[in-house]
Structure formats: structure tokens, C-alpha cells
Amino acid sequence: MSSLSAQKCEACHADAPKVSDEELAQLITKIPDWVPEVRDGIMQLERVYKFKNFKQAIAFTNKVGDMAEDEGHHPGLLTEWGKVTVTWWSHSIKGLHKNDFICAAKTDDVFNAL
């Protein structure tokens, strides 16, 4: 468990600050398998997880969904045969907040616990 995954998400409102470039550079080192991507002008975190079959992929998707509900922060999830793409960003600020890094680390913990 990383120090990020031990943290709890805080409520994020439209006036919450996005992570700075310096914070992004620091936080991304704690979740090295995640890739920062810009989509439609919005910075997001993305990772693809590989599985042996669809049953494992959907089970992982459901566990990530449970974690997201517990945190009150919800990712984009694309479940396909043998893989799940997870994308985190904060809709209210149209970018990345520390919550996204916390949840990315928690997603890694879900995967590592399988």
C-alpha cells in the first residue's frame, strides 16, 4: 500500500485547485504505471490492466466500482475481454486533483490484491 492509497478523498468543488505541474511530477512517481493524458483539453490519468479473461476483468471492474463509491470519486472504466482501462480525473475542475492520484493508487491496491 502506497502512502497515497492510505489517504481519503476530500470533497472537490469547481473552485478547487488543479494539481500544478510540479505536483504532477512529484505525484506521478508514486503511481509509475499510470500515464497522464490530455483528452478534449482535460488532463487525466490512465492505466490499462491485463487479465486472462472477461470474468476476471469484470470482477476487477466491480471492485474498482466499490472502491470508487467508498471514496465518492468515480473513474471512467472500459471493460473488455482481457483488459480494463481505468481513467481518473476530476470532472468538477476539468483536470487533475490530488483525489485522482489517491484513487489511482487505491486502484493499484485493488489489482494487487487479486
UniProtKB/Swiss-Prot annotation:
Protein name, as recorded: Putative pterin-4-alpha-carbinolamine dehydratase
Entry keywords, A to Z: Lyase
Family designation: Belongs to the pterin-4-alpha-carbinolamine dehydratase family.
Organism lineage string: Bacteria, Pseudomonadati, Pseudomonadota, Gammaproteobacteria, Alteromonadales
Record-level GO BP terms: tetrahydrobiopterin biosynthetic process
Stretches that traverse the bilayer: none
Catalytically driven reaction(s): (4aS,6R)-4a-hydroxy-L-erythro-5,6,7,8-tetrahydrobiopterin = (6R)-L-erythro-6,7-dihydrobiopterin + H2O
Entry keyword annotation includes Cytoplasm: no
GO molecular function: 4-alpha-hydroxytetrahydrobiopterin dehydratase activity
Catalytic activity, EC: 4.2.1.96
